[in-house]
């Protein structure tokens, strides 16, 4: 499997500079940052991933509103909050373009402490996300939609 990645030009290792840069990223979410986002930490949010997954990069939420309508949320990890444009991590992730999932391994687009920890939408942790929130009728008619920065738990 490693040969497939090498033949496709996919780097197997991150540069030392990229690893060091990833370790310097602050892990605390500030109150200032929370105030700039729609707070969905009180909404039941869940991922749908294999049991052995570590990089939970997307999540869903669903709730019945008092009006009888439904609210559906689609949430994706806000990696852009942590990766500065033009920096080494940005350049290396651009070169990779994606994480590659093979039967025996995952070669991530970003170092594991970002993909599996900082930006992984793990249970019982506050995480920064981009979300699409859609309100629909029981018949599926879209009543409203909202797209923006959020924080989920």
Question: Model segments located where?
Answer:
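Charge-lined substrate channels and their catalytic hotspots, especially those that engage the 3′ end
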Residues: 1-73, 80-125
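Short beta-strand segments
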Residues: 75-77, 135
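Polynucleotide-recognition surfaces of large bacterial nucleic-acid defense/processing enzymes
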Residues: 127-153
